[in-house]
Amino acid sequence: MGKLIAVWGSPDSGKTTFSVKLAEALYNRSRGKSAVIVVFTDIVTPTIPVIFPNFRSEDVFSVGTILTKPDFFADDVVSNMVMTKDRMNLGYLGYKDSENKHSFPDYTEEKAKYLYDVLVGIADYVIVDCMSLPDSNFLTSVALEKAEQVIR
């Protein structure tokens, strides 16, 4: 069972940068043997296009796609992760460019909890880059609730 780490703080405080750097450090410390997943919860300003600016839109997937499915499993989550070829144990989940809170139907708190249960079941570390306002979405509020460690 993996460890859920939530990164939370004020707007523009470097949460996303810290989340990516922490994921890289954990991945490198294990020499690529630890599976690390970063979840970007920001639906207002999607992070995936910022982290992967040169990826084609068909090579980038959305966490919103997973959350709108009636049922999903570990394979569905893995197939919707963004990974680079040289770091197959380092995955990223988040929203794509041009997506916003109106792009997908609403999902439940239980579905967010289930997503994190699936993620900690398949990864050694799950790092959640939370939105500054915990009530902004269930991905943020559930991560702060379920995290073994909250970095602020």
Model features per residue range: what roles?
Residues 20, 105, 109, 137-140:
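Conserved strand-to-helix beginnings and helix N-cap segments that scaffold or border functional pockets
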Residues 34-35, 89, 149:
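Residues at the starts of beta-strands that form the adenosine-phosphate
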Residues 30-33, 87, 120, 144:
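Alpha-helix termination/capping residues and helix-transition junctions
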Residues 114, 120-121, 125, 130-152:
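Conserved catalytic-core segment of NTP-binding enzymes
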Residues 3-73, 125, 130:
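Walker A/P-loop NTP-binding active-site region of P-loop NTPases
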Residues 13, 98-103, 133-135:
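Short acidic, S/G/P-rich loop/turn micro-motifs used as interaction or catalytic elements
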Residues 38-121:
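P-loop/Walker-type NTP enzyme "switch/lid" segment
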